[in-house]
């Protein structure tokens, strides 16, 4: 890292800290030549590849905006939505990929949204998964009920931690 003061090509890291949300690292550096200190902030880029093939930077705001529609009229606060968006970003970043499909972002939203509000989850899933009939809704509701029952009795069928997969016919 070049010193911004004397342009010396090297510097020593004095202190490193991760930001509160874990998306960046703040490093305090010192130049061995002039002795001055400076701060750098390192972030990783995360791009979302849309169906059209266009890549855009990941945006928590877009996650919140999409989920907010499903949560209209529900007891879900803005803080809840912000936390959900943070969890989604953490899940995606944990994969280590620099680019992720928009479909994967949608899948990452479903789990935390289901925990937050089941009605909002059904609304979001109905649009995201393209429910086209009452049977699609019934299957989703049945899966939610089965999951709730398994949470009450973890040994019911040994799959309490197994993800619920909904299939739709289009």
UniProtKB/Swiss-Prot annotation:
Entry keyword ATP-binding: yes
Q: Which PROSITE patterns match?
A: ATP_CONE (PS51161)
Zn finger region (unnamed): 3-34
Q: Which InterPro entries match?
A: ATP-cone_dom, NrdR-like_N, RNR_NrdR-like
Domain (ATP-cone): residue spans on this chain: 46-136
Cofactor binding remark: Binds 1 zinc ion.
A Gene Ontology biological process term: negative regulation of DNA-templated transcription
* Single GO term (MF): zinc ion binding
Annotated family = Belongs to the NrdR family.
Function in brief: Negatively regulates transcription of bacterial ribonucleotide reductase nrd genes and operons by binding to NrdR-boxes.
**Name the record gives this protein:** Transcriptional repressor NrdR
Organism whose genome encodes this protein: Beutenbergia cavernae (strain ATCC BAA-8 / DSM 12333 / CCUG 43141 / JCM 11478 / NBRC 16432 / NCIMB 13614 / HKI 0122)
**What lineage is on file?**
Bacteria, Bacillati, Actinomycetota, Actinomycetes, Micrococcales
